[in-house]
Curated annotation (Swiss-Prot):
The gene is rpsL. Keywords: Methylation, Ribonucleoprotein, Ribosomal protein, RNA-binding, rRNA-binding, tRNA-binding. GO terms for molecular function: rRNA binding; structural constituent of ribosome; tRNA binding. CDD domains: Ribosomal_S12 (cd03368). With S4 and S5 plays an important role in translational accuracy. Gene3D superfamilies: Nucleic acid-binding proteins (2.40.50.140). It comes from the Bacteria. This is Small ribosomal subunit protein uS12. GO terms for cellular component: small ribosomal subunit. Coiled coil: none annotated. One of its GO terms (biological process) is translation.
Length: 123
């Protein structure tokens, strides 16, 4: 524990709070247009082809968003809505695309956690 004199010489510095989703600019979601839809591979030790899209947002930011769920209909010039939320094993992917909104269709044949994937209630 430092003495009073030590604290006068070198005061305590609060850690800098860094924004994890700067492109949202304090908004819950942002709209954007897909400029490129592609797959990428995750970091070790995982192995897959993860579906991602490069998105030009309405505020001019260009970000990479993850496309959750099985199968999607996105292509270049699709209009999408993104939310915050990183993908731990994909470096640089800090946003998720919201399914079932704008040009993004919901996941077909989804029975559980439907609201997260924009799937309607099955009859």
């Amino acid at each position: 524990m430092p003495t009073v004199n030590q604290l006068i010489r070198k005061p305590r510095v609060a850690p800098v709070k860094r924004n994890k989703v700067p492109a949202l600019q304090s908004n819950p979601q942002k709209r954007g247009v897909c400029t490129r839809v592609y797959t990428t591979t995750p970091k070790k030790p995982n192995s897959a082809l993860r579906k991602v899209a490069k998105i030009r947002l309405t505020n001019g930011f260009e970000v990479i968003g993850y496309i959750p769920g099985e199968g999607h209909n996105l292509q270049e010039h699709s209009v999408v809505m993104i939310r915050g939320g990183r993908v731990k094993d994909l470096p640089g992917v800090r946003y998720h695309i919201i399914r079932g909104l704008l040009d993004t269709q919901g996941v077909k044949n989804r029975k559980q956690r439907r609201s997260k994937y924009g799937a309607k209630r099955p009859k």
